[in-house]
Structures are given as structure tokens and as C-alpha cells.
Amino acid sequence: MKQNKKLLVMAGGTGGHVFPGLAVAKKLQQQGWEIRWLGTADRMEADLVPKHGIEIDFIKVKGLRGQGVSKLIKAPFQIINAILQARRHIKAWQPDVVLGMGGYVSGPGGIAAWLSGIPVVLHEQNAVAGLTNQWLSKIAKKVFQAFPGAFPTAEVVGNPVREDVVALADPEQRMAERDGDIRILVMGGSQGAKILNDTLPVTMAQLGEGFTVVHQAGKNNQQQVIEQYKSHSVDNVQVTEFIDDVAQAYEWADLLVCRSGALTVSEVSAAGVGSIFVPFMHKDRQQALNADHLVECGAALMIEQPQLTADKLANTIAQLDRNELKMMATKARQAAKLDADVTVAEAIKALAK
């Protein structure tokens, strides 16, 4: 009896690492592969991955950035211990290939796989490579990048995006008969973005009628943001902590105001929605670089955080009529790379032969 091939996915910490890993995992599951996950017990993958029917093993590992001297001295021992933990899981399950999607867990897991003679495939979601993937790229059999620039020679494939987002109708079809209020979707990620939560109520008060807003405020921010909109007499708004059906939200929206994390940029492009990006201020400008290609092709606008004011945002939105928004949405969809999950899955299959 032929035994199914096995993939171990290493990804954790944030949705930007976990969701693309799930997209590749689902693609291979549909082809009969067995999937297992390596993560950490105190991050989002611990809850999210089992909900998708995938078993998960845990190792203890933390990031090194921002640690005090005493913790840095202990770091080599903690890393070695994490590698040994990962190697025990790998030895017990015997995967054919290991896929690293980033996050702290990928480092020890990737080294353990390499020491075990198991091929490692990497995917970097951001325009600036994370420290873990920089290290692992030297031992990986195949390296992919979502945006140009993370690695000098890696294949650019985009980010694996959820199937329900990819399946949305083209923006020309979706937006053809729309009239009435311009629909604005505000997203700051699962934790929200304070600057968006503070700025949008003032912006919408300045813009007045003609707009409807759905605002994802993030965990524990909902009531405060509702009060801010009320204090500025803005009624045509729905504020929520989370958006469960992101694809439906993209389908509804005419314009997105959001951060430019790697997964958000890829999803916005795949969905075909015009955007105003307000990048988080990383030292390496990671989020700004993620969004550059959509800005350059006319699919999005960018306001860097130091320049963001309610006045500037209101003036920017006021200049976008329905025709302009449709054009931006179409350009976003044209720029999308919709088969990243297939490309990564095929590379994994080739290495397992």
C-alpha cells in the first residue's frame, strides 16, 4: 500500500505567517498529503491551526530582539534546546519535506530538519526578509519570496491567499452597478491600529455625507471607537473588533484604509480593491516596501504615518470618485499573483520524489 507523503509546516506568531502556510497546507491536503504543524503554545497558531483540522506540535522558543543582556547570554542554550525539541518531533513523524513560513519557530525547526536530512522550502512574505529566513535561506533547497527585494535571486510568487478571497468576482463585475454612498473598509489588523482608530472618526466628520464605513477596531477597542464616532456625529458607521468573513468585507468595499502588512497587501490585490495604505513604522520600512508595487501601478495610495492627519486623509478620499475607485480596483486585481499556493506546493512535491 502506497504511503501518503508528509509535510511539516513551521509558522507562527502572526496571521501573516500562519494563513499563507494554511493555504499551502490545504492545497497539498487536497492531493492526499498528510500535514502536521510546528508552532509555539502561546501564539495564535495554537488555537488557529487545530480549527483547520491539522495536528500541531509545540516547541519553546522566543525572539532575541529587544532582550536584556542576561537573556542574550542564555539565548544559545535556549536555541540549542529548541532545535533538539524540534528534532524529536521530526524524528517521531518523519516528514518528507519541511516548509518554513517565518516566525520564531521556523529557525530551530529548519535547522533540525536540515540536520535530519529533510529538504527545507522557505517562503518569505515581506519585502524585507526576516532574520530567521535570512539564516535559513543558506540551507534551504528552495526559497520563494512574495515581493521583489527580500532575496536577490529567489523566485517572486506572491503570498498564498485564502481561496474565498481569490474566488471573488472581478471588480469590474462587482462594482458595475454600484451607486449611492462610497463604502470604506477600515482595517488595522487583529490588534487594531491606534492611529487609524483615532484619525478616521475625525476624517469622516470632515467628509460628511456620501460615505458608509465598516471599521475593524481590533481587540478591546470597539466601544472606544464607537464613542469617538458618536462624539463627531458620524452615524453611517459599523464598528467591530474583528471581521470574521474578510472575503465578504473586501467584496462589499469600494475603498480600503489599512496597514500594509504582507498578507493584507496580497489579499487586497487578489480581491481587487483600491486602497489607502498607512504603513506601520518599521525601522527597515518593511510595510512601506510591501505596498510599493501597488502604489507604483496605480492600484493604491500611501500616506506614511508621520504625514497622516485627518485633513490629509479626508482630502485624499474626497478626490476618489467611483470611476477612480473602479480603476484602482482593476489595477489591484491585475497586479495579483493568484497561484502562489500552487507554485509552492509543486516545489514541495518535486522535492519529495
Swiss-Prot record:
<dbReference type="GO" id="GO:0008360">
    <property type="term" value="P:regulation of cell shape"/>
</dbReference>
<comment type="similarity">
    <text>Belongs to the glycosyltransferase 28 family. MurG subfamily.</text>
</comment>
<keyword id="KW-0472">Membrane</keyword>
<dbReference type="GO" id="GO:0050511">
    <property type="term" value="F:undecaprenyldiphospho-muramoylpentapeptide beta-N-acetylglucosaminyltransferase activity"/>
</dbReference>
<keyword id="KW-0132">Cell division</keyword>
<keyword id="KW-0961">Cell wall biogenesis/degradation</keyword>
<keyword id="KW-0997">Cell inner membrane</keyword>
<feature type="binding site">
    <location>
        <position position="190"/>
    </location>
    <ligand>
        <name>UDP-N-acetyl-alpha-D-glucosamine</name>
    </ligand>
</feature>
<dbReference type="GO" id="GO:0030259">
    <property type="term" value="P:lipid glycosylation"/>
</dbReference>
<feature type="binding site">
    <location>
        <position position="162"/>
    </location>
    <ligand>
        <name>UDP-N-acetyl-alpha-D-glucosamine</name>
    </ligand>
</feature>
<keyword id="KW-0328">Glycosyltransferase</keyword>
<dbReference type="Pfam" id="PF03033">
    <property type="entry name" value="Glyco_transf_28"/>
</dbReference>
<dbReference type="InterPro" id="IPR007235">
    <property type="entry name" value="Glyco_trans_28_C"/>
</dbReference>
<dbReference type="GO" id="GO:0005975">
    <property type="term" value="P:carbohydrate metabolic process"/>
</dbReference>
<dbReference type="GO" id="GO:0051991">
    <property type="term" value="F:UDP-N-acetyl-D-glucosamine:N-acetylmuramoyl-L-alanyl-D-glutamyl-meso-2,6-diaminopimelyl-D-alanyl-D-alanine-diphosphoundecaprenol 4-beta-N-acetylglucosaminlytransferase activity"/>
</dbReference>
<dbReference type="GO" id="GO:0071555">
    <property type="term" value="P:cell wall organization"/>
</dbReference>
<protein>
    <recommendedName>
        <fullName>UDP-N-acetylglucosamine--N-acetylmuramyl-(pentapeptide) pyrophosphoryl-undecaprenol N-acetylglucosamine transferase</fullName>
        <ecNumber>2.4.1.227</ecNumber>
    </recommendedName>
</protein>
<keyword id="KW-0133">Cell shape</keyword>
<dbReference type="GO" id="GO:0005886">
    <property type="term" value="C:plasma membrane"/>
</dbReference>
<keyword id="KW-0573">Peptidoglycan synthesis</keyword>
<dbReference type="GO" id="GO:0051301">
    <property type="term" value="P:cell division"/>
</dbReference>
<feature type="binding site">
    <location>
        <position position="287"/>
    </location>
    <ligand>
        <name>UDP-N-acetyl-alpha-D-glucosamine</name>
    </ligand>
</feature>
<comment type="function">
    <text>Cell wall formation. Catalyzes the transfer of a GlcNAc subunit on undecaprenyl-pyrophosphoryl-MurNAc-pentapeptide (lipid intermediate I) to form undecaprenyl-pyrophosphoryl-MurNAc-(pentapeptide)GlcNAc (lipid intermediate II).</text>
</comment>
<dbReference type="Pfam" id="PF04101">
    <property type="entry name" value="Glyco_tran_28_C"/>
</dbReference>
<dbReference type="InterPro" id="IPR006009">
    <property type="entry name" value="GlcNAc_MurG"/>
</dbReference>
<keyword id="KW-1003">Cell membrane</keyword>
<dbReference type="InterPro" id="IPR004276">
    <property type="entry name" value="GlycoTrans_28_N"/>
</dbReference>
<feature type="binding site">
    <location>
        <begin position="262"/>
        <end position="267"/>
    </location>
    <ligand>
        <name>UDP-N-acetyl-alpha-D-glucosamine</name>
    </ligand>
</feature>
<feature type="binding site">
    <location>
        <position position="126"/>
    </location>
    <ligand>
        <name>UDP-N-acetyl-alpha-D-glucosamine</name>
    </ligand>
</feature>
<feature type="binding site">
    <location>
        <position position="243"/>
    </location>
    <ligand>
        <name>UDP-N-acetyl-alpha-D-glucosamine</name>
    </ligand>
</feature>
<dbReference type="GO" id="GO:0009252">
    <property type="term" value="P:peptidoglycan biosynthetic process"/>
</dbReference>
<keyword id="KW-0131">Cell cycle</keyword>
<feature type="binding site">
    <location>
        <begin position="14"/>
        <end position="16"/>
    </location>
    <ligand>
        <name>UDP-N-acetyl-alpha-D-glucosamine</name>
    </ligand>
</feature>
<keyword id="KW-0808">Transferase</keyword>
<comment type="pathway">
    <text>Cell wall biogenesis; peptidoglycan biosynthesis.</text>
</comment>
